[in-house]
Regions:
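ABC ATPase "signature
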Residues: 216-217
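Conserved ABC ATPase "signature" region
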Residues: 99, 103, 110-128
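The feature captures the beta-strand-to-loop junction immediately N-terminal to the Walker
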Residues: 37-39
Length: 265
């Protein structure tokens, strides 16, 4: 039996004595897309930050490629992290931004231009290579954000609400990028509020509430249960008193950039 690329077992986390994650189990295989669904404060972002190696669980384990991403640098480098916020330098061009991330990923000067070109081709942004990121639309910036996460040639890409606030054209472009990544065997974990998006993209979905995964399976099965009113009762009972601070409070741009860049170092 092939070991899954990502295995989370009994993961628990608390902030300021408030439970954020509670005994979470999750697996994700290569070339698979898993959608994390649930309301604000359900624990989606916190779980993704655990998997990205930004946080360590207070109980349980997180493994990516059999290694602990919080403690093992090589494991973190196998992960592409795309936060909700734009983690780019607005005054630098698209190519210059990607060059910074390529350097952080340890790519040598001679290979850097090729790595940047490959990431731009995969995300279909080569036409904007010489334009400052700050002059691009929000949807285009999100594609540059995804391209930046690919500099480490990750086996796993984590995306937190990648299509939030973008128009239908930009949404379709981002969906196309994710489809190409899956074809290359990349594992993808995407947090979203949009059931239609999850149904279109994901092989499986996990519905979170109150720091727990309360439903997991195919979207068809989950939607059938929703129509029958089954999960609502459980979700209502397990919703937290308020959203987790790290999931709703906007963070300074420099803080987000530093967090993303840390994963590539």
């Amino acid at each position: 039996v092939t070991e899954p690329l990502v295995r989370v077992a009994g993961a628990a986390l608390a902030y300021r004595d408030r439970r954020v994650l509670d005994a979470v189990d999750l697996v994700l295989g290569a070339g698979e897309i898993l959608a994390l669904l649930g309301p604000n404060g359900a624990g989606k972002t916190s779980l993704m930050r655990l998997i990205a190696g930004r946080l360590a669980p207070q109980a349980g384990t997180v493994r990516v490629g059999g290694q602990d991403p919080f403690r093992v640098r090589a494991a973190r480098r196998a992960i592409g992290w795309v936060p909700q916020e734009i983690a780019l330098y607005p005054r630098l061009t698209v190519a210059e931004n990607l060059g910074v991330f390529a350097q952080l990923a340890g790519i040598g000067r001679r290979e850097r231009a090729m790595a940047v070109a490959e990431a731009m081709a995969l995300t279909d942004i080569a036409e904007a290579a010489g334009r400052p990121v700050g002059l691009l639309s929000g949807g285009y910036q999100r594609r540059v954000n995804i391209a930046a996460s690919l500099m480490c040639r990750p086996a796993l890409v984590l995306l937190d609400e990648p299509t939030q606030g973008v128009d239908l054209v930009a949404r379709a472009a981002i969906h196309a990028v994710l489809g190409r990544l899956r074809e290359e065997g990349t594992a993808i974990l995407i947090a979203t509020h949009d059931f239609a998006e999850a149904e279109r993209l994901a092989d499986r979905a996990a519905f979170m509430a109150g720091g727990r995964i309360v439903r997991e399976g195919t979207l068809a099965d989950m939607l059938a249960e929703l129509r029958a009113g089954i999960p609502e009762r459980e979700v209502a009972l397990s919703l937290p008193a308020g959203p987790a601070a790290d999931e709703v409070e906007p963070r300074p741009e420099a803080v987000v950039r530093a967090e993303v860049q840390h994963l590539h170092q």
